Amino acid sequence: DRIYTPKEYWNEGKAYQHSYACNKIYRKGLFEDVRFPKGKVFEDLWTLPLLTGKSKTIATASVGHYNYCWNPKGITATAKGKELNMLLLAHIQLMGFEELAMADNAEYFMGVVNIQMDVHELTGNAPLLVGRRVNDIGKLNGKLKLKAIMLNILGLKYLCKLNKFIHKATRCLS
């Protein structure tokens, strides 16, 4: 029920929370030089920014029905470190699209920090996400606000280590 520019769609419309290709309608011409990447999971997030970047406007509608069936064997349910690392890389690519200004969106950035913490916990790999201070903490709520404060104090590397330690300690106490 709204018309967005690509920047508005990704930030105000929070497209990063629903970046699935299957529940959208596209003009055929958008796919002339855009393809879903082979060998990557979460391929929708790799592709949707390219498609929206070729569009002047994006329309959304509140009418319709999307019947999603949970698949316990699907990628969302079974993703491990390797798959979440691909998701993280797709988000890092998305933040590189300056015209979308995603890197300036504190809520989005902290969501990507969460993915980075999961990747570190599952793989032990050093963070790939470029850490930065979150200046607009006041826009965040609850756990995201606390994590942003901790990110600003500790930095990303040590926030990842603290997160891993807390999860390990919690499992030991259970």
Each model region followed by its residue ranges:
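Catalytic core of nucleotide-sugar-dependent glycosyltransferases
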Residues: 65-72, 78-105, 119, 124-137
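Extended, low-polarity segments enriched in aliphatic/aromatic residues
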Residues: 56, 63-64
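Membrane-interface aromatic/basic loop that binds lipid-linked glycans or pyrophosphate carriers
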Residues: 122-174
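Amphipathic alpha-helical repeat scaffolds of TPR domains
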Residues: 108-118
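Alpha-helix N-cap/helix-start motif at coil-to-helix transitions, marked by capping-box chemistry
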Residues: 20, 25, 62, 85-88
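Structural motif
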Residues: 100-109, 144-149
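Donor-binding/catalytic cores of nucleotide-activated saccharide
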Residues: 1-58, 70-80
